[in-house]
């Protein structure tokens, strides 16, 4: 298990971080086996996990716990592999490799149990590790898992907290700016703060009624929606190809929105005065090009 992975670099596909995070050939083989078991688990019913709390025990307790390996049971076999891997890393005193493998073990345990009441065990384990490695640059790996958890949340419980995730990222970036994988926190922080906008409109609106813009947005404080009437004849319009149609501006509405890091939904309504073909244009800060959609207004719009 002590054979350095670089000994086989000619036949392995090595990532930039492989020598640091997977330092021996044994590490590579264990993780390859875990990948195979994960594939098997998708196609075979797995035995339920009974001793859930021990799965989140500190690493020195986890490596001592008895794990009954069952034939064709991916869960027990994977946990046993993590246990064997951690035992070898503890024996070799590879502190950094122990942390990485332990983080993977905790995430795996949380995933296979998959119940919201176990989230506290997972978070508690990560926070304990964060304290243990408080001065070690590898703490960034722990912070990344914590930030991911709070950013992505759990579909069962309401534990999603993008602001907390962002704070964790920023604290890690300030504390360990030169860590070789600090970009994982920078990239996640960028994703959390990124402005996202999507919308849909009705293809037909009755004249005198309002077009409803179903808007989903994140990290956005203001949006402008402009309405234009296409003034060309039907024949001219159909033969436009890629040419921009002749437009008559009808209105522009600017809406103030609650700027938050989590996604929100709302409906914005614009009056449509007369029959005709319309272009609706959406613009907001930092959007390099306004987005346009088209719809029609006719007295037949409400007929199914």
Q: Model segments located where?
A:
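N-terminal, cleavable Sec-dependent signal peptides of secreted/periplasmic/extracellular proteins
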Residues: 1-304
């Amino acid at each position: 298990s002590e054979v350095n992975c670089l000994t086989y670099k000619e036949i392995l596909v090595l990532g930039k971080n492989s020598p640091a995070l997977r330092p021996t050939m044994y590490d590579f083989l264990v993780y390859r086996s875990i990948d195979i078991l994960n594939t098997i688990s998708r196609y075979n019913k797995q035995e339920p996990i009974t001793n859930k709390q021990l799965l989140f025990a500190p690493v020195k307790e986890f490596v001592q716990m008895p794990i009954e390996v069952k034939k064709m049971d991916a869960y027990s076999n994977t946990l046993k592999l993590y246990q064997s891997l951690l035992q070898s890393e503890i024996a070799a005193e590879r502190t950094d490799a122990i942390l990485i493998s332990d983080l993977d073990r905790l995430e795996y345990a949380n995933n296979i149990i998959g119940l919201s009441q176990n989230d506290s065990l997972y978070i508690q384990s990560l926070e304990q590790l964060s304290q243990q490695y408080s001065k070690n640059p590898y703490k960034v790996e722990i912070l990344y898992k914590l930030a991911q958890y709070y950013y992505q949340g759990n579909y069962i419980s309401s534990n999603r907290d993008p602001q907390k995730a962002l704070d964790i990222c920023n604290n890690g970036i300030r504390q360990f700016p030169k860590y070789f994988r600090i970009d994982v926190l920078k990239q996640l922080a960028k994703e959390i703060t990124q402005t996202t906008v999507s919308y849909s409109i009705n293809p037909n609106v009755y004249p005198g009624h309002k077009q409803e813009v179903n808007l989903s947005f994140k990290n956005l404080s203001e949006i402008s929606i402009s309405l234009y009437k296409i003034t060309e004849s039907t024949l001219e319009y159909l033969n436009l190809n890629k040419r921009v149609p002749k437009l008559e501006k009808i209105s522009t509405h600017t809406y103030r929105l609650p700027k938050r890091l989590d996604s929100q939904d709302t409906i914005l309504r614009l009056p449509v005065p007369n029959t005709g073909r319309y272009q609706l244009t959406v613009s907001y800060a930092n959007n390099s090009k306004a987005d346009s959609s088209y719809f029609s207004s006719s007295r037949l719009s409400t007929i199914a």
